[in-house]
Swiss-Prot record:
NCBIfam families: hrcA. Keywords: Repressor, Stress response, Transcription, Transcription regulation. One of its GO terms (molecular function) is DNA binding. This is Heat-inducible transcription repressor HrcA.
Length: 351
């Protein structure tokens, strides 16, 4: 069940007064990083309620699970449930400045003809704009997007496959041979392979099968680097306030490339099932089901290229500037989609 559905289903009865107080508590915690009491709520947020009334409202919010006391203060901070309600119902996305718009445009105003370059730029840009870890993920490869394959003869026992996708992604794979092969045999093999691709008889996930099923020489197919790439920029920024053990766990998780890909693919599938029309999504670490990421949040947008979907976004501490971050990602996402659409049109003109 998504966070949106879960929250809305559990607290349909929250009053406007409770919303007002909850919004102030979460905003204060995100901004200051500290608990807040009834007097501060009245002074800082101009809430026209008595301190006694606010204390009663806070007690009700605590009973409902939206806020909690800390061990060191009588003030309150939001729980994960409070965060989720704030993000889905109360948060107003901040508009980005004209200077930020111009800075983003300057990054994307140069002609780019490969998705990989767009994603590299985007990962770096998002990390600079937000000071969080910028993330950009290619779409999961499907079985209908191979344009052609080139085989490069390295030596008698090694051939490199260069796989060109319809969206201009270029992948490489090393093919290890059981016994010697000549350049002429490699040329013959690439002709056979591309003929099958043109006839839709073989796709990206079948290339290994093509080699291993033939009476040929191939006995090993490297797959250390899966065909879906992702780019993470400024990962240390999200680890500043964590202890050494937690930092080690997070770094080890991000080093497991398969786990990372599965996480992002899961998010894409989840949004597809929800049929979400939101441009920017937020998921808290506890919703990811990954222990190493429980104290973090992921703010992201999904882009589309040729019917396949990928992700751009940032990962940072749970106490992050959501309003500003969501505004930035929303604008960057629009720029990325415009650039991809332009790239696709140029490609179609050449067909």
């Amino acid at each position: 069940m998504s966070a949106n559905k879960k929250v809305r289903g559990e607290i349909m009865g929250i009053s406007e007064r409770e919303k007002l107080v909850l919004n102030a508590i979460v905003d204060y915690y995100l901004t200051v990083g500290d608990t807040i009491g009834s007097r501060t709520l009245v002074k800082k947020y101009g809430i026209e309620l008595s301190s006694a009334t606010i204390r009663n409202v806070m007690a009700d919010l605590e009973d409902m699970g939206f806020i909690e006391k800390t061990h060191t203060s009588s003030g309150r901070i939001p729980t994960d449930m409070g965060y989720k309600y704030y993000l889905t119902e109360l948060l107003k996305v901040e508009k980005i400045t004209q200077e930020e718009i111009e800075n983003i445009s300057n990054v994307y105003n140069r002609r780019v003809d490969e998705l990989e370059n767009i994603l590299k730029k985007t990962s770096t840009l998002l990390s600079k704009l937000t000071n969080y870890a910028g993330i950009a993920v290619e779409p999961k490869p499907d079985n209908k997007k191979v344009s052609r394959v080139e085989l490069v003869y390295i030596d008698e026992y090694l051939v490199m496959a260069i796989i060109v996708m319809d969206d201009r992604r270029v992948k490489t794979k090393n093919i290890h041979l059981a016994y010697p092969i000549s350049k002429e045999e490699v040329e013959k093999k690439v002709d056979e392979l591309n003929a099958k691709i043109r006839n839709n008889e073989i796709a990206i996930n079948d290339i290994e099968k093509f080699f291993t099923e033939s009476t040929d020489i191939v006995y090993e197919y490297d797959d250390e680097d899966e065909l879906s790439k992702y780019f993470i920029n400024n990962l240390p920024s999200m680890l500043k306030n964590e202890n050494i053990a937690e930092v080690t766990d997070v770094i080890e998780f991000f080093n497991e490339r398969k786990d990372i890909r599965e996480l992002f693919e899961k998010l894409i599938e989840q949004k597809a099932q929800e049929n979400s029309k939101s441009n920017v999504n937020v998921i808290l670490g506890d919703e990811l089901g990954i222990k190493e990421l429980e104290d973090f949040s992921f703010v992201y947008s999904i882009y589309d290229i040729g019917g396949a979907q990928g992700i751009i976004g940032v990962m940072g501490p749970k106490r992050m500037a959501y309003s500003k971050t969501m505004g930035l990602i929303n604008h960057v996402s629009r720029e990325v989609n415009k650039l991809i659409n332009s790239m696709e049109k140029d490609k179609n003109k050449k067909v």
